[in-house]
Amino acid sequence: MATLSVKPSPRFRLPDWQTNSYLLSTNAERQRDASHQIRQEARVLRNETNNQTIWDEHDNRTRLAERIDTVSRWKEMLDKCLTDLDAEIDALAQMKESAEQNLQAKNLPLDVAIECLTLRESRRDIDVVKDPVEEELHKEVEVIEATKKALQQKISQAFEKLFLLQEARQRLNSDHRGKMETLDIDRGCLSLNLTSPNISLKINPTRVPNGSTSLQQWDDLSRFNKDHGEAEMKKAIELREAIALTIAETNNELEAQRVATEFAFRKRLREMEKLYSELKWQEKNTLEEIAELHEDIRHLEEDLRRKLQNLKLCHTRLEARTYRPNVELCRDQAQYGLTDEVHQLEATIAALKQKLAQAQDALDALYKHLARLQADIACKANSMLLDTKCMDTRRKLTVPAEKFVPEVDTFTRTTNRTLSPLKTCQLELA
């Protein structure tokens, strides 16, 4: 007879089985409810995050666009400031060059004034006088030195200002380049989208790079660079106006002094020509007086010789009558007449000798004074020649260098004109 073989195992009770089924069913429902809740929350989260992401992307795109507009406006302001600054640098450089040319041009008047002073050092004797011409020439040298000093000061100021303008331009240019690069970067960022092929995850993109500044610092720095450049341009404009005024004033002062100096030269030349004519007239009269005195001396000498002959005759007669014999040797009327004649002749001869001596002394005095007159005439001729050469030299100040032809050369000869007798005499005496 067959037997039932039963593996021994624990047996659950029916309530346990029922409880297990209930728990499974209950847990299934609870898990489904939890899953449903998670699904609902996930849907809400997805919607919210999608909306937030879309909004954030739109908001940041708007911010990027606004930032691009802001940087673009600053870039345009910097563009204008740089353009104005470049124009001002060119204008100031041209004004500085003009001042340098004016400074260089002052060398010619200075050389001419010094040459005139040097030429006038060749005056002789009494003509070496501190006259108005010399005073005006010294004043001209002082005016030229003062104008050169003023121009040199303005040139130095322009050089320093150009350096400051270049420095401001470098700051503006650096700021401008930075904004150009920023615009390129931000425009590139604005052009990116979700389908762009070059987007990727980066390592710590939210880090704050070293050297970062706040928006206020950025705005302050940009404004400072712009304001600094504009302030330097304003100062440069004022300096340009001051340089132009200095050039005009120095040219006017120098021209006024040139006119005053040449007026003094012309006045002095007229004075010397008048005195030269007076001295020549005195020389002519003195020469005529000398000639007349020579003639009178000759007549005196002839009269003296005749009187000596008359005296010899009287002496001979008186001497001969001393040999009359005996009583014939009497003092008769003839004797008294001859004696009186001798005394008269001796007095006449003495008077003639005295007058001849006086005439000789007068002649010597006339010759000495004539020598002084001629020496002074030579001095005046020399002085007039020197001042004429000075006036000719000063023509360089008004005649272009390529058209300048000296009227008086270094050998005291004149060219290209006919000399007056007075000028010819001046050159001969010189």
Swiss-Prot record:
<comment type="subunit">
    <text>Microtubule inner protein component of sperm flagellar doublet microtubules. May interact with CCDC172.</text>
</comment>
<dbReference type="GO" id="GO:0005879">
    <property type="term" value="C:axonemal microtubule"/>
</dbReference>
<keyword id="KW-0963">Cytoplasm</keyword>
<dbReference type="GO" id="GO:0036126">
    <property type="term" value="C:sperm flagellum"/>
</dbReference>
<comment type="function">
    <text>Microtubule inner protein (MIP) part of the dynein-decorated doublet microtubules (DMTs) in cilia and flagellar axoneme. Plays a key role in the assembly or attachment of the inner dynein arm to microtubules in sperm flagella and tracheal cilia. Forms filamentous polymers in the walls of ciliary and flagellar microtubules.</text>
</comment>
<keyword id="KW-0282">Flagellum</keyword>
<keyword id="KW-0597">Phosphoprotein</keyword>
<keyword id="KW-0175">Coiled coil</keyword>
<feature type="coiled-coil region">
    <location>
        <begin position="81"/>
        <end position="162"/>
    </location>
</feature>
<keyword id="KW-0206">Cytoskeleton</keyword>
<dbReference type="Pfam" id="PF03148">
    <property type="entry name" value="Tektin"/>
</dbReference>
<dbReference type="GO" id="GO:0060294">
    <property type="term" value="P:cilium movement involved in cell motility"/>
</dbReference>
<dbReference type="InterPro" id="IPR000435">
    <property type="entry name" value="Tektins"/>
</dbReference>
<keyword id="KW-0493">Microtubule</keyword>
<dbReference type="GO" id="GO:0030317">
    <property type="term" value="P:flagellated sperm motility"/>
</dbReference>
<keyword id="KW-0832">Ubl conjugation</keyword>
<keyword id="KW-0969">Cilium</keyword>
<dbReference type="GO" id="GO:0160111">
    <property type="term" value="C:axonemal A tubule inner sheath"/>
</dbReference>
<comment type="similarity">
    <text>Belongs to the tektin family.</text>
</comment>
<dbReference type="GO" id="GO:0005815">
    <property type="term" value="C:microtubule organizing center"/>
</dbReference>
<protein>
    <recommendedName>
        <fullName>Tektin-2</fullName>
    </recommendedName>
</protein>
<keyword id="KW-0966">Cell projection</keyword>
<feature type="coiled-coil region">
    <location>
        <begin position="265"/>
        <end position="379"/>
    </location>
</feature>
<dbReference type="InterPro" id="IPR048256">
    <property type="entry name" value="Tektin-like"/>
</dbReference>
<dbReference type="GO" id="GO:0015630">
    <property type="term" value="C:microtubule cytoskeleton"/>
</dbReference>
<dbReference type="GO" id="GO:0060271">
    <property type="term" value="P:cilium assembly"/>
</dbReference>
<dbReference type="GO" id="GO:0036159">
    <property type="term" value="P:inner dynein arm assembly"/>
</dbReference>
